[in-house]
């Protein structure tokens, strides 16, 4: 894996890791720990140079759990994906039925480590969509693609999306495509990528409501203040 990072940085190509691993073997002892350290070092050196994406499809525990934390984007499979440094049952009284801290739901909603969760097919599709929006490396200008959408078109329903800015961002984006990151974490804020006139643009916005596919609204009751503290 460390050699793959060397080649990726030399070529200026993204690294995508698909993880389903039971962890290191105790028989390998310090050799395995040294290998983890080497991988962490390569990831740190690649940070900001090439995109790093991790998808957890099965077990990802112990020292390997640090890897998703060092990558730029992390995805998890809903049912089989498990992400933990210490096994959840290492905590007294912590059972899966009470709080599965290794699950995709917990890691995306509470820990905020996971950008998106879903089935294997959904995750692979999301990775493809994300890769299309990102440059291959920090020197690449390939985050631009030919645009067939009119930048000056009228967004007739934009006012109706004022409360849920995720919808507003999709409305103004080329072909109404918005890739949202950390979708389940801190829903009062929206972050992600859109395209404007073919160019990838990072987006951040606050919102007060979240609308589902059926139009039902979840009120968040949050406001964004520009001053250090809320007014009296």
PLM regions with names:
Residues 1-26, 193-207, 212-216, 227:
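A structural preference for short, pocket-lining loop segments at secondary-structure junctions
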Residues 110, 121-223:
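Intrinsically disordered, low-complexity segments enriched in small/flexible residues
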